[in-house]
Amino acid sequence: LRDNQDDSDFSAFMSIWFYEEQKHSLVLMDYLKRFRPDMVPTEKELHAVRFPFDPAPALETLMLHFCGEIRLTQWYRRASEWHTEPVIKKIYDTISKDEARHAGAYFRYMKRAIEKMGGEAKLAFAKIGVLMASSGKSGKPLHPTNLHVNKNLFPNDTVQSRLPDPEWLERWLDSQIQFDKVWENRV
């Protein structure tokens, strides 16, 4: 919303997107409360990942969201395949489908931007696309949660850096759900 204030249609979509993303976290936390209460995040931990992002160019923000949704689609799909417990499998499968639908919506907004702005939009999308696609070479998964977003808070300005265990994501991907090169290539 911050970077697209002049686009009421996109802003309306972002409101729906935010609601659905909140739904994902609430469902996952409810699952933890029922089956792994020792892993439920505290209010302090939740508050730590809520901080302001610096303003960013609207087109790059759009592409970043698209890339994040594509990556999350695959992460959750892999988590659903990896787990054997039926409830969490279904939760991850449903979230994966939601993320794919979100990516589709972002893609439609990207196509609209290309129709309106042509080369300017293509250049902005290419810059972020190269950044997000390079994660296989860096050995670290690139997703908006581990990109620096607030100069005044650097280096503690990524969502991942504010987790109680900042190395959790890599461990989950590499050791638990085994998001390997085959899965990375799907992204």
PLM features: residue spans?
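Non-heme di-metal
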Residues: 1-187
